[in-house]
Amino acid sequence: MKNNNVTEKELFYILDLFEHMKVTYWLDGGWGVDVLTGKQQREHRDIDIDFDAQHTQKVIQKLEDIGYKIEVHWMPSRMELKHEEYGYLDIHPINLNDDGSITQANPEGGNYVFQNDWFSETNYKDRKIPCISKEAQLLFHSGYDLTETDHFDIKNLKSIT
């Protein structure tokens, strides 16, 4: 990896990878904010992907097969992996439950419960990208001490009409 930034090229590579695996996913985090605004607003250390938890083993195996190494293992809540060429990837398995609810394992035990309408899609660079909604992004940027980057992302989210 030339630097610590994950570019649009790596982003599209990862999105293509999830689509080729036929795994339902949503872009989250900083790249999710930028996709919602319609342009890259800042540099990114990683890509955050929420995905259908029933495919967790398949996703991890594929990522390891192409050279990703596990850096942080907080499963079933999240896992952070690093690739020398593609950079950091933060994966978050989510449960698409039969009753229509969506949950994610909480690292302290129990589950986070998400609203279905938080999982949306937007157009970015002539591509339809599943992503976490503006409302959910704003909610996820609360309840902790915000960084300068968080404040920047919130400002950009609030600029979306």
From Swiss-Prot:
Keywords: Antibiotic resistance. Coiled coil: none annotated. GO terms for biological process: response to antibiotic. SUPFAM superfamilies: Nucleotidyltransferase. Signal peptide: none annotated. This is Lincosamide resistance protein.
